[in-house]
Amino acid sequence: MKHFQIPSFSVLIIALALPHIVEVQSSAEKLDFKSSIVDIEGLGAMSFPNSGAAEAQEAFFRGVLLLHSFEFTQAAEAFRKAQDLDSDFALAYWGEAMTYNHPLWGQFDGKKGQAALLRLAPTREARQAKAPTERERRYLNTIETLFFFEGEKETRDRAYMKAMRDLHETYPEDDEARAFYALSILGSKNGSRDFATYMQA
């Protein structure tokens, strides 16, 4: 895969940690992000509490960390492995769907993203029922917005950005929500880049 000089997720996370971020008091379930850090050799460490089976965790975390590096093909393979190990692991299907959206390059495969989510369950309601926690349901909702929301891609990008903002504001200690929200801001500009957008991200 050809690599481009673009901001990494690490840079986006650092930028979003600056003081201009508005802190939001959340009434959501209490999650301990600091004590649930997982280290995947060669890729890095992260915290992403989830309800997947223990045997599917390494593949899932590998998939998310590969997303950080924009290694979409390898990430999709890792998420599918997590699905094989736990067929009801909702976030593994969320992760695979994420690999079919490349917002910084304006690349989007809606059919593959929808197919990944439909393998979890045939309807939005059934997919939501597969997610045991409110936070996981919110993650699923963001990707549903991107792949199933009516309207042109630009409209769906804006709706996805709003859904990611809501997720980030509900779980301000969730670094993954913070990073994916930053990426959604950049993706909402339909491939164009400007200073104001980068500052917002």
Located regions from the model:
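N-terminal pre-domain segments of enzymes
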Residues: 24-53
